Amino acid sequence: MSTHARPLAVWLAQAPDAQLAALFEARGVRADVAWSDFFDAAEALLEPASIERALPRLPLTEAVALRRSVNGDDAGDDAGPLIALALLRPDGTPAPPVAEAVTARQDPTASETPPPEPSDESAAARAAERAFTTVAALADLVLLASDTPLALLTGGALASGEKRRIAATGTAPETLDDLAAIAVDAGLLAALDRRLVATESADSWLRESASARWTGLVQAFRAALPRGLRDGDGWLPTTAWAAQYPWSTAWPEQCSAIAERARLLGLIADDGSEPEWAVPLREGAPADPASLQRMLPTEVDRIFLQNDLTAIAPGPLQPALDVRLRRIAVRESAAQASSYRFTADSVAQALTSGETAASILDFLAEISLTGIPQPLEYLVTQTDQRHGLVRVFTDASGRTRVASVDATLLDAMGVDQALRPLALARDADGLTSRAGRDTVYWTLTDARYPAMIVGDDGRPLVVDRNPAPGHAPPAAPDYLPLIARLRERQGPDADAAWLDRELEAAVRSKAVLLVEIEMPDGTARELQLEASGLGGGRLRGRDRAADVERTLPVRSIRSARVIDPSAGSGATATGER
């Protein structure tokens, strides 16, 4: 048993709950760890494996400070964080297990890094174009996730099938994982049950201007940076990022990914220089997109509607208009001038999401430079007339019922093999199913039946197939039960508790102890005892000098030291009352 754990255990017992929770989280402690008391916690935190896991997480300044402390120098201002991580004692010195682990690693070196060179006009223009492309690609990604959650692999990357589907929109496949990471940091997407889903905040972000979208993304990107890259409210020069976690073998790959996201957001130019709009962010100020906005194409608020059921936007369509138009039509091409196509399915989808024929036609009339062509008006009105021919609702008995004035439709649904999982049964009033109302509705919709959910009052209901979760930061482990358990086992006398642990360890290892006993007359006597048992408040063992078995009251033991056989009466560990 390590004697170095004893002072750490005392410090842990005196620390507030919040400080303990922060320490356990930073050191990667499981909330359900089977520690019995603070001595267990201290020993676990000083185990070589635990220390080896903690060191790679130290940013450069703390790694340098810890190395200074190991070398016998003052850790300086970074002593506080290292003490909070239980890598330094409260006096600023490292415990021997920490010193041993640090000594085995290379010396970290810190150096001043000047700010990056400002971008010239050409490099800034390319960075602005990339930022614009990234914002548009993220909007596509969020819209796709709103319609159908995106499948994730076990490691958190997008599944290959999803990448192929997204790449069909024109987004470069190699950027998709970085785009998803940017969206997650911004709270637009969230990973749930190995699926990437759009959050509640995604809808409002989609309706913002391109510069406002970019502002939200880059400020979230900054907030999510690892603490080793932060400089106050801003970040360190990007040229210094690679050196910030000197003891982490995974950092080069992580740093490369973070730098690529910064490049995608237009915060780093291709030549490594810094565009004008990145400077306030690096310095910790709010984002100022004015200089970026000057390099972005002007957004338009009108489109050309054509007789072939297509729409042409002569420039980047304002995001709010683009989002609504894409709920009604399929976007066929995405560029500074985009094209959209209206189909019966796309209009039906809009009606399903809550639009009406009147709202669709009013919207198109408002943004069209060419009026509404007759073929498009006919498509909308005909689709609207057909929509809702099939009504889905829950009857008084709790079963799902499918009704329609068109008996032919009911007959078709009754024999449709695609609907077999619903087990539809025909009766005089239509079809019934044991499946839930929403399940029946979406299955019919996927099979392209003009279905509509109606409530108890017979009015249409709009149901979101993939309700967006609220954006919340990942829940931190709950260490309160663990801390409460450790405090319950915390006795009033830390010295006595430590002695008990030393004696238990000696019995388990059948060690030879040099025991100091307090005699009834107040004097002290030392015995060499081969520990054999502990119980009932008594220590049992063979007295080496007298070669007899002795039973000693634990309350009379002042101290116990494990004797190193190779050193005669040398001591290797100490427990004192």
Q: Where would I find each of the regions flagged by the language model?
A:
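Short, amphipathic alpha-helical interface elements at domain boundaries
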Residues: 1-247
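Primarily hydrophobic membrane-targeting regions of prokaryotic envelope proteins
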Residues: 22-25, 63-68, 79-87, 164-167, ...
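Extended alpha-helical interface modules used as scaffolds for assembling large macromolecular complexes
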Residues: 214-529, 533-538, 545-548, 559-577
